[in-house]
Design a protein with these regions (language model features):
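Charged, amphipathic alpha-helical segments and their flanking helix caps
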Residues: 1-38, 48-147
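A short glycine-rich, His/Asp/Glu-containing loop-to-beta-strand
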Residues: 42-46
Length: 147
């Protein structure tokens, strides 16, 4: 499995085990909130996004190079509640995701660091469904040229 997939699967796994709030449905497949029942909220869609890579060391004997990568992972959280409770519910979800991901910033030992860098509130959903889009940056290193 690629490191990118290992990171995404780790994020899915830790979010599936989160409590208060507990995420009922966590997936790497896109979510259509109109197709979900009330019992499936709050739910999360995790997707790997863009990535920047650079050499960390020059090539050495044997042709290997240590590289460093910053992978952006989108964590899209859907909540369903009354319009009066929407802001509170979204804020609770944001805080919980950050706390859960901070518990192991190495993503099970494959990364060097994990940080929540951006929170975007999307109000273009129906009034009882809220969406917060979290950008998670994961720093990891890998070696190229290994046989």
């Amino acid at each position: 499995m690629s490191i990118r997939n290992s990171i995404a699967e780790n994020i899915v796994s830790v979010l599936e085990n989160a409590t208060d709030p507990q995420f009922v449905f966590v997936t790497r497949a896109p979510i259509d909130p109109q197709q979900l029942s009330n019992a499936q909220y709050p739910c999360v869609y995790v997707e790997t996004l863009d990535e920047s890579r650079e050499d960390d060391t020059m090539g050495v004997a044997g042709g290997t190079t240590q590289r460093q990568s910053i992978l952006n992972v989108g964590v899209n959280c859907y909540v369903k509640t009354s319009p009066e409770m929407m802001d509170i519910t979204r804020n609770d979800v944001i805080e919980r995701v950050e706390e859960v991901l901070d518990a192991d910033r190495t993503r099970g030992g494959v990364a060097w660091d994990t940080q929540l860098t951006t929170v975007t509130v999307n109000n273009d959903v129906e009034s009882t469904i809220g969406l917060v889009q979290l950008n998670i940056q994961v720093l990891y290193k890998y070696t190229t040229g290994e046989a």
